[in-house]
Amino acid sequence: MESALPSIFTLVIIAEFIIGNLSNGFIVLINCIDWVSKRELSSVDKLLIILAISRIGLIWEILVSWFLALHYLAIFVSGTGLRIMIFSWIVSNHFNLWLATIFSIFYLLKIASFSSPAFLYLKWRVNKVILMILLGTLVFLFLNLIQINMHIKDWLDRYERNTTWNFSMSDFETFSVSVKFTMTMFSLTPFTVAFISFLLLIFSLQKHLQKMQLNYKGHRDPRTKVHTNALKIVISFLLFYASFFLCVLISWISELYQNTVIYMLCETIGVFSPSSHSFLLILGNAKLRQAFLLVAAKVWAKR
C-alpha cells in the first residue's frame, strides 16, 4: 500500500493542477476579454488578473518540484536547479500572499467607514495606496531572496566539499528547514496586515449596525450586505493563509521525522489551496460567476 502512495498522490496533484490552471486561467481570460471590449478595467479585476497569474506560476512550480523530488532528487538538491526552484517558489508565493493582503486592504478602504482623517486620506486615494503597497512589497521580496540566497550558497559550499549521499541528505534537511523558517518569517507580515484589516472590517460593520438600530432602519440595508460580502471574501483569504501555514507546519514535521508520506501530503495541500480558493473568488465575483454559469450551462447542454 505504501509503495502505491506516490502514484496516488501524483494523480491527486495532477488533478488539482488541471483544476487550478482552469480556474485561474478562467479568471485571467474573462477579465482580459472584458478589458479589451470595454477598454478599461476596475482595480479589483486588475488585482485578480495578477493574483491568478501568480497562482498559475505557483501551481506549475509545485508540480515541477514534485516530479524532481520523486525522480531526479540529485538535481533537486544541488546546483542551479535548486536555486531556480527555490527562487521561483519564493516569487510566486510572495505575490500570492501579498495580493491576498492587498485585497483585504482594498475592501477595508472601500467599504469600511471611519472618521479618522488618516483613514479618510487613504480612502480617497485607494488606488494609489494599493499601487504603493504593491511596489513596497518588492522590498520584502528582495530581502527574502537575499537571505535565501545566503542559505543556498552555504549549502552548495558544503555539498561540494562533501559529496557523500548520506551526509548530503541529512545536511539538506537542515538547509530546507532554514529556508522554510525564513520564508515563514517573511510571510507573517502580510498575514498580520490581512488579519488587522479583517478586524477593522468587523468593527466597522458593528458600528454600522448600531447606527441602523438607532435610526430604526433595520439591518437589511445595502451597506450591511456590502460589509458582509467583503467579510466573506476576506475570511476566504484568511483561510488561504491558514492553509499556507498548515502546509509549512506539515513540511517541518516531515523534515523532523523524515516521513515521505507527510511530505507528499504537504505538497497536495500546497496545490489544493490556490486551486480551490480561485473557485471561491469566481463565485464571489458577480461578473465571473455569471460567466462561469454561462460556460457551465453551454457545456452541460452539449452533453
UniProtKB/Swiss-Prot annotation:
Domain of life, per lineage: Eukaryota
Gene Ontology biological-process entries: detection of chemical stimulus involved in sensory perception of bitter taste; positive regulation of cytokinesis
Protein's UniProt name: Taste receptor type 2 member 13
Note: Most taste cells may be activated by a limited number of bitter compounds; individual taste cells can discriminate among bitter stimuli.
Membrane topology summary: Multi-pass membrane protein
Keyword tags: G-protein coupled receptor, Glycoprotein, Membrane, Receptor, Sensory transduction, Taste, Transducer, Transmembrane, Transmembrane helix
GO terms under cellular component: membrane; plasma membrane
Membrane listed as a keyword: yes
Effect of N149S: In a breast cancer sample; somatic mutation
Residues bearing attached sugar chains per UniProt: N162, N166
PANTHER family found in the cross-reference section: TASTE RECEPTOR TYPE 2 (PTHR11394), TASTE RECEPTOR TYPE 2 MEMBER 13 (PTHR11394:SF28)
Chief location of this protein within or outside the cell: membrane
Subcellular localization, as worded in the UniProt entry: Membrane
Ranges of the Extracellular topological domain: 1-7, 77-85, 150-184, 254-261
